[in-house]
Swiss-Prot record:
Heterodimer of an alpha and a beta subunit. Substrate binds at Y192. HAMAP family: Succ_CoA_alpha. GO terms for biological process: succinyl-CoA metabolic process; tricarboxylic acid cycle. CoA binds at T49, G50, K51, Q52, K75, I128, T129, E130. Residues 1-22 form a transit peptide. This is Succinate--CoA ligase [ADP-forming] subunit alpha, mitochondrial. It catalyses: succinate + ATP + CoA = succinyl-CoA + ADP + phosphate. SMART domains: CoA_binding (SM00881). It is found in: Mitochondrion. Belongs to the succinate/malate CoA ligase alpha subunit family.
Length: 331
């Protein structure tokens, strides 16, 4: 049974890759700037009145995020947390001109909610939901690649935050500090570890993107790296990967090429979770599985190191290593 699931997952990944090649990659790449949220970003919550949606919408508002409303077809026309409730995301967009949506919709309906947001041309869609069927996300992935209006972060992710300005997700806001380090991660809890360390070292964060641990993320490492490399406020980058797939190896190749073309390369520090995971066993996330001898932590470490990335063998040293790398630039 497990072998069948592993084979299916591998096949889906291959199908997705070939499908993406057929579509126009340049279209979806145009949405990368949509990730740069700020204090003016207006946010709609899909699944607004549910327990999780309510809790995290309130926390976002407390942080200063401009939450302008939410959706619930059964409660359209009412208010919740002092904000309007709309029947559809299309109606919400017409009334609020929102810049982003946060998806707190149960797994069976979440892909549909994402597709509705794409149809409504929401610039940034942040899908927090875990457990969305992979066939559904494969369909969403193909839809994303055919358009240039909406950018997806997630699913199964902690979200995205620009410290001191805007929070869309479930991350603990108090550990963040405005600063100069861009953080991108497949792991939620390890994201918080990197955030806390860069706060403690007084570097702070320019933008933190939790891309999620599912096999078909709306935003990958390379998307985030492109944003960070072009962002003048980002001086260093922390990349946290996991076993499984080839996202980290792809990122390594991109970093190698990008830094070769820059007069002053931006330092990158990386940690890969799951180094002790046995072959063929899924570790936590749906995408964290070593299959067919590929996707091992060792292979990822090797690829990243060859690209000039500073490797952290423990998550506890991410903060100190990025400080060391930044100090090297001063000498």
């Amino acid at each position: 049974m497990f072998k069948t699931q592993t084979t299916l997952l591998t096949s889906l990944r291959r199908f997705s890759s070939s499908s993406q090649l057929k579509n126009s990659k340049s279209l979806y790449e145009q949405t990368i700037p949509n990730l740069m949220i700020n204090s003016d970003t207006k946010v709609i919550f899909q699944g607004f009145t549910g327990k999780q949606g309510t809790f995290h919408a309130q926390h976002a508002m407390d942080y200063g995020t401009k939450v302008v409303g939410g959706t619930n077809p059964k409660k359209a026309g009412t208010t919740h947390l002092g904000k309007p409730v709309f029947g559809t995301i299309e109606e919400a967009m017409k009334e609020t001109k929102a810049d982003a949506s946060a998806v707190f919709v149960p797994p069976p309906l979440a892909a549909g909610a994402i597709e509705e947001a794409i149809a409504a041309e929401v610039p940034l869609i942040v899908a927090i939901t875990e457990g969305i069927p992979q066939h559904d996300m494969l369909r969403v992935s193909d839809i994303l690649k055919t358009q240039s209006k909406s950018r997806l972060v997630g699913p199964n992710c902690p979200g995205i935050i620009r410290p001191g300005q805007c929070k869309i997700g479930i991350m603990p806001s108090h550990i963040h500090k405005p600063g100069c380090i861009g953080i991108v991660s497949r792991s939620g809890t390890l994201t918080y570890e990197a955030v806390n360390q860069t706060t403690q070292t007084d570097l702070g964060q320019s933008l933190v993107i939790g891309i999620g641990g599912d096999p078909f993320p709306g935003t990958n490492f390379i998307d985030a790296l492109k944003l960070f490399l072009d962002d003048p406020n980002t001086q260093g980058i922390i990349l946290i990967g996991e076993i499984g797939g080839s996202a980290e190896e792809d990122a390594a190749e991109f970093i190698r090429a990008a830094n070769a073309s820059r007069s002053t390369p931006k330092p990158v520090v990386s940690f890969i979770a799951g180094a002790t995971a046995p072959k063929g066993r899924r570790m936590g996330h749906a995408g964290a599985i070593v299959a067919g001898g590929k996707g091992t932590a060792a292979a990822k470490f090797e690829a990243l190191e060859a690209a000039g990335v500073r490797i952290s063998r423990s998550p506890a040293t991410l903060g100190s290593l990025i400080v060391e790398e930044l100090n090297k630039l001063k000498h």
